[in-house]
Regions:
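Ligand-site clamp/hinge motif
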Residues: 241-246, 275-325, 466, 475-482
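N-terminal lobe/hinge region of extracytoplasmic solute-binding protein
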Residues: 29-105, 250
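Structural transition elements
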Residues: 255, 391-436, 454-460
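Long beta-strand-rich cores associated with HINT superfamily self-processing modules
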Residues: 579-611
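Acidic-aromatic pocket-rim loops
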Residues: 338-341, 346-354, 396, 484-543
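Surface-exposed binding/hinge segments that line
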Residues: 152-232, 261
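Extracytoplasmic/peripheral linker and loop segments enriched in polar/acidic and small residues
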Residues: 13-15, 366, 370, 374, ...
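Gly/Pro-rich hinge or "lid" segments in bacterial periplasmic/extracellular proteins
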Residues: 64-66, 213-285, 290, 421-422, ...
Length: 611
């Protein structure tokens, strides 16, 4: 297979000349089905769209997983406040969680009060100043589905105590100088009216996370004049005025879209000279003046373009099969970054009644699921599927690189694989002892066979799982998940097993634990797991105001997740990406990211041997 790849990449196209004519432009290859033509940041969260949106627009803050702190963006600082509006901070300026619990643990207090102060020197790309009225507008419309028509925005703001019913504001949880701050008891001086906003959020320590990091702030002066219940923000049939705003974005991010140069085959971004965030010495935050994204629809063609010098960076993770090829090339920076997503095998443990059948019913038996989990050999998958570019994943589905949350007690299954297979067969001999002439187990005379939903790129993984499960007499095969697996199969229980990547950390756990293991319906709990003990622990973890208790509950949840054998870990894959070093240097490896990450963009500079 590797020889075929190399032959194709070196001979299937004529070399041609190097197409990086501008020395100040970073040429970035992106493998997508297509490039977006509309850039309203809430329109799409797939493909390259969120990457571009994150460069054109800003959120209030970003989150640093390593430090656990919010990094200023539009927001300059934030803190919880008490009933008198006084900051709940320690002497060193960090959140005083002990006092927060003391102040708000009383059940009579229904919410946490948060004060956000934004920078006073931000402008939109059209030159208009950005104020808290833009922040208010963005969070307000996110809660008003009659105007936004955006289910994701409702999820981002689910813990914000600012609610609409049929377009009517029924509960106010946002307060500025112009919107009820004084009436609520928050005194904002007139000179601070453009920079201070108060939020009321549910008594959940993670409630501010999506409000701060997921909601890209929109310019009120651009959208308020055109958005109505008849012409919603997220419109399938936008008016001419709305369509113009989609295509010619006005943002507050570090780049602006060059609409004249951008089109269906390329996206050109120009660095703003007036962006409010800079390096400590006052120089631009990013050294790159222009970024040109070039569309490729095949990964092999994109790699060929990189090797031949048509692009500087390939902004896609690639298979570890290409590592051998890259290592033979000069002028390449290979990023083999640790991954943050755990690939899991999700079992349909509780399908809706219309999708139940005798074979699928076996997955509702916990001991049967334990046998499946025992048969998984992560080391073998990492060796053969990832070519060694990955690490084993915990049965508690928490990364061991997060020591404050990872609980090794969740990893209690035997380490020796032969012992695991022997135990799995002993379990199955008590449940489905009959086998056919090929050694596969039978149920009522029928071979037990499960289909595993996956993408074409996941066929290798499923093929090796087929070999592993054969050792315990269980037959599995690959089933294409298609383009809309959630609505076609997963939300409707029309599957046996599926591959699914998960990633849990303090930044998402309040939402994701519930979505993956408790909530039913259109959630990531595809197999409809129901475990009341687990539900209670997740609920307690979510609502405790004691940070130490929260950490303890996160650890307590992991062994219970492991014992359900519901989302069985397969591996954590590295994120492999590549860039050229003949024109730019300063690429950084960041956990869970391709080489084109924020750290790289802030450190990239021209190479002395640029040519």
């Amino acid at each position: 297979m590797m020889g075929i790849m190399v032959l194709c990449l070196t001979s299937c196209q004529n070399p041609g000349q190097i197409h990086r004519p501008n020395a100040d432009t970073l040429y970035v290859g992106s493998v997508q089905a297509s490039f977006p033509t509309a850039y309203m940041p809430w329109l799409s969260r797939e493909g390259i769209a969120p990457t571009i949106a994150g460069m054109l627009y800003d959120s209030l803050f970003s989150y640093d997983e390593d430090t656990g702190n919010f990094v200023p963006s539009i927001g300059q600082e934030w803190y919880y406040v008490d009933q008198a509006g006084e900051p709940i901070l320690t002497e060193d300026g960090s959140i005083d969680y002990a006092r927060l619990e003391e102040v708000y643990s009383d059940p009579s207090h229904k919410y946490l009060a948060v004060k956000v102060i934004i920078h006073d020197n931000i402008t939109w790309s059209d030159g208009k100043p950005l104020t808290v009225e833009d922040v208010y507008y963005s969070l307000d419309i996110a809660t008003n589905n009659l105007l936004s028509n955006h289910a994701g925005a409702l999820a981002w703001t689910s813990d914000l105590r600012h609610k609409y019913t049929n377009g009517v504001l029924t509960q106010r949880g946002l307060f500025t100088y112009e919107h009820g701050a004084r009436e609520q008891g928050y005194e904002i001086a007139e000179e601070d009216k453009d920079t201070v906003i108060y939020l009321h959020v549910n008594k959940v320590l993670g409630s501010v996370m999506p409000l701060f990091t997921s909601v890209l702030i929109l310019p009120k002066h651009i959208w308020e004049p055109v958005v109505t219940p008849q012409n919603q923000l997220n419109s399938a049939a936008p008016t001419e005025e709305t369509l113009y705003r989609y295509r010619y974005p006005v943002g507050s991010g570090q780049f602006v879209l060059d609409t004249e140069e951008s089109g269906s085959q390329q996206i050109v971004l120009r660095r703003r000279t007036d962006y409010h965030r800079t390096k400590e010495d006052g120089s631009p935050l990013y050294n790159i003046e222009t970024i040109k994204y070039v569309l490729y629809q095949e990964i092999n063609v994109a790699i060929y373009a990189l090797l031949k010098g048509h692009i500087d960076v390939l902004d896609n993770s690639v298979s570890s099969n290409y590592l051998q090829l890259f290592e033979k090339e000069k002028d390449l920076f290979i990023s083999n970054a640790p991954g943050t997503y755990i690939q899991t095998l999700v079992l349909n443990v509780n399908p809706v009644s219309s999708e139940q059948n005798p074979i699928r019913d076996l997955l509702s038996i916990k001991d049967f699921r334990r046998a499946i989990a025992l048969a998984v050999n992560q080391e073998d998958l990492i060796k053969n599927v990832l070519n060694g570019a990955g690490i084993p994943a915990s049965s508690g589905l928490m990364r061991s690189t997060l020591p404050d949350f990872y609980n090794p007690d969740a990893d209690y299954l035997p380490i020796d694989y032969q012992a695991r297979v022997a135990e799995a067969n002993a379990i199955l001999d008590t449940i489905v002892p009959d086998r056919d002439k090929d050694g596969y187990r039978l149920l009522n005379g029928e071979r037990i066979t499960f289909s595993i939903l996956g993408s074409p790129g996941e066929q290798d993984c499923i093929s090796y799982l087929e070999i592993q499960f054969q050792k315990i007499g269980i037959k599995v095969n690959y089933a294409a998940k298609g383009t809309q697996p959630e609505s076609t199969y997963l939300y409707t229980s029309r599957f046996d097993m599926t591959l699914h990547g998960v990633s849990f950390s303090l930044s998402n756990i309040d939402i994701m634990y519930n979505a993956h293991f408790s909530a039913l319906g259109r959630t990531s709990n595809y197999g409809r797991l129901v475990n009341r003990e687990l539900d209670t622990l997740i609920e307690n973890m979510r609502f405790t105001l004691n940070l130490n208790t929260k950490y303890d509950l996160i650890k307590a949840i992991q062994p219970i997740l492991a014992e359900e054998y519901y989302k069985i870990p397969l591996y954590t894959s590295n994120v492999i990406s590549v860039a050229r070093t003949d024109r730019f240097i300063g690429y950084n490896i960041v956990e869970g990211s391709t080489v084109l990450n924020t750290s790289t963009l802030q450190n990239l500079k021209k190479s002395n041997v640029s040519r």
